[in-house]
Amino acid sequence: MKKTLLASSLAVGLGIVAGNAGHEAQASEADLNKASLAQMAQSNDQTLNQKPIEAGAYNYTFDYEGFTYHFESDGTHFAWNYHATGANGADMSAQAPATNNVAPSADQSNQVQSQEVEAPQNAQTQQPQASTSNNSQVTATPTESKASEGSSVNVNDHLKQIAQRESGGNIHAVNPTSGAAGKYQFLQSTWDSVAPAKYKGVSPANAPESVQDAAAVKLYNTGGAGHWVTA
């Protein structure tokens, strides 16, 4: 299940988290009550939606009784999700894709199953698609990339799948809970770190699709898919 929330009000939030100094650790390195957190996540305990599990920035991932759980915060936004261990793409209690002007990057929708949607691709350029296992080992498989419809930027298959899960491909989507916006559900701080100077401080949802695509490709190429919990 993926939730993205403001500290006063999911990662992703990362929806998406990038460049924030903080405390990142696997759950095995921290004194966490895995059983309690797992039970709260499985029951969609509203406490997880109302406040972070601890103060400050953190990033915890652990396996418990057949499921993988993830809890994170950049100190302002916080998120959590879980899925069956080893599952590829289907969160057990998932993020609902955004449509029109309501779009969770990581969100409050309960018991909605994420689906990967892959548009037909024509071979042009190749970029690696990272697939990360629970022990953080990464294997790369090739993905094709081509320009998005309405954009001249080459976007690889993996990013297109991320865009579908994050916003349904809606470039004007906005998550009213987390503030994440645009086709790739950027948080404003993340957007400002990769957007052209002209669009820094501007909501991603108000930027042209080609600008959003270019920013997403830049973020993906510099940090991989880890910026998106739905990846």
Swiss-Prot record:
Polar residues: bias regions: 96-116, 138-153
- Quote the EC number: 3.2.-.-
Q: Where is this region: Disordered?
A: 92-153
**CDD domains from the UniProt entry:** RPF
Determine if Signal is one of this entry's keywords.
yes
User: What is its induction?
Assistant: Positively regulated by sigma B factor.
The principal location of this protein is secreted
SUPFAM superfamilies assigned: Lysozyme-like
Q: Which GO terms fall under molecular function for this chain's record?
A: hydrolase activity, acting on glycosyl bonds
Keywords, alphabetical: Glycosidase, Hydrolase, Secreted, Signal
The organism's place on the tree of life at top rank = Bacteria
Q: Which family does it belong to?
A: Belongs to the transglycosylase family. SceD subfamily.
Kindly provide the name given to this protein in its UniProt entry.
Probable transglycosylase SceD
Q: Which gene encodes it?
A: sceD
